[in-house]
């Protein structure tokens, strides 16, 4: 328990840099860097909200496919091609939800997520780390990594007014390419325009 409290304190101090104070917040990518992004390669698949209930578009990296066996209308799972029948395949899921926080209240949203994760980790030997940054699209992003030794779960929360997109990587193999695939999905996510 003492280890979790120390990690939590370090995480709160680390995440404090994502506040409203312009001198300590992470730098948002410039408009130029957002517009200079590469289009998905022919081997990648761009998914739009017309394909599912997720209100946005994103790119599924080459070598990954939808897991029909695990996906639902509100949460889509992806696994590496050829691993559908593995006992514990690395997987990436995407889910969009609503919350009671405006974008200006993102720190309260972050604190609620930390509290929820700590409740879920009660009694589990794990290390929790957190970070705050921006996606390549310029959206606020909170990243929480839960290391249980043999399983590493990384949660990427892309934040907007009264909502979020959670892309979660569950990494059983320790593969760095799996981590990169999840981050590529996060950075490619674009909210549908509301109107």
Question: Residue spans of the language-model regions?
Answer:
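Soluble non-cytosolic domains of exported or imported proteins
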Residues: 103-108, 176-180
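Short, well-structured beta-strand
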Residues: 139-195
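Bacterial N-terminal signal peptides that target proteins for export
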Residues: 1-5
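N-terminal targeting sequences that direct proteins away from the cytosol to non-cytosolic compartments
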Residues: 6-8, 18-77, 170-195
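Repetitive helical segments and hydrophobic/amphipathic motifs
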Residues: 11-12
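Signature of long, low-cysteine stretches enriched in small and polar/charged residues
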Residues: 112-158
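Secretory pathway targeting signatures of secreted, lumenal, and periplasmic proteins
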Residues: 57-103
